[in-house]
């Protein structure tokens, strides 16, 4: 699914997102949600140079907005599952970047759009591996696509570290409610 798909619910959702931002109702989006936020706010969504499936490092951008959201954190391992990416919409600031996908997250005031998945659980990882097996096979030569064994290696410790970052982001976001 793409934010660019011609589905009957996308245009009303984009308008809903624009209205929420205009009224300063805090919004948060993960992956497709981040892409929809970007598009609603004047950004674009297009194919990423490579498919990203599995674990990968993202870096915290070197700017004050990123520091407000992530403190002194420099980089962390996160989960990815996408073939498209968003541009940073006008007025927003990139707060996370990656080797294979430059725009991993942006902030616009109290609003947070992410390409990466900080919300993962062990059950989600296993479910996505099972339901995405064909996609993993199709894109296995991508430098950013992992196999099931790689994704599940040390799964709980990886998730524990990721949840520390997620808590930081969600705490910052929910403080604005």
Regions found by a protein language model. Give the residues of each.
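Flexible gly/pro-rich beta->alpha loop and the following alpha-helix that scaffold active-site loops
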Residues: 1-28
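Generic recognition of short, well-ordered alpha-helical segments
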Residues: 8-11, 32, 40, 90-91, ...
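Glycine-rich, phosphate-binding/catalytic loops in enzymes
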Residues: 9-14, 45-46, 96-97, 130-132
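Residue-level signal for well-ordered alpha-helical scaffold segments within enzymatic catalytic domains
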Residues: 12-15, 19, 39, 123, ...
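Catalytic nucleophile loop
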Residues: 20-44
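Pocket-forming structural segment of enzyme catalytic cores
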Residues: 41-124
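Acyltransferase
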Residues: 120-177
């Amino acid at each position: 699914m793409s934010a660019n798909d011609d589905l009957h619910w996308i245009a009303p959702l984009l308008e809903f997102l624009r209205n929420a931002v205009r009224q300063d109702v805090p919004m948060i989006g993960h992956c497709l949600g981040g892409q929809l936020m970007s598009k609603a706010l004047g950004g674009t969504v297009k194919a990423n140079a490579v498919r990203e499936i599995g674990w990968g490092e993202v870096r915290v951008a070197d700017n004050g907005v990123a520091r407000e959201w992530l403190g002194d954190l420099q980089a962390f391992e996160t989960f990815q599952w996408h073939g498209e990416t968003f541009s940073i919409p006008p007025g927003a600031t990139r707060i996370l970047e990656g080797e294979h996908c430059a725009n991993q997250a942006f902030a616009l005031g109290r609003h947070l759009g992410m390409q990466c998945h900080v919300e993962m659980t062990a059950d989600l990882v296993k479910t996505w591996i099972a339901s995405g097996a064909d996609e993993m096979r199709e894109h296995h030569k991508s430098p950013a696509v992992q196999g099931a064994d790689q994704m599940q290696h040390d799964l709980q410790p990886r998730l524990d570290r990721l949840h520390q970052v997620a808590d930081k982001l969600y705490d910052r976001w929910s403080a604005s409610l």
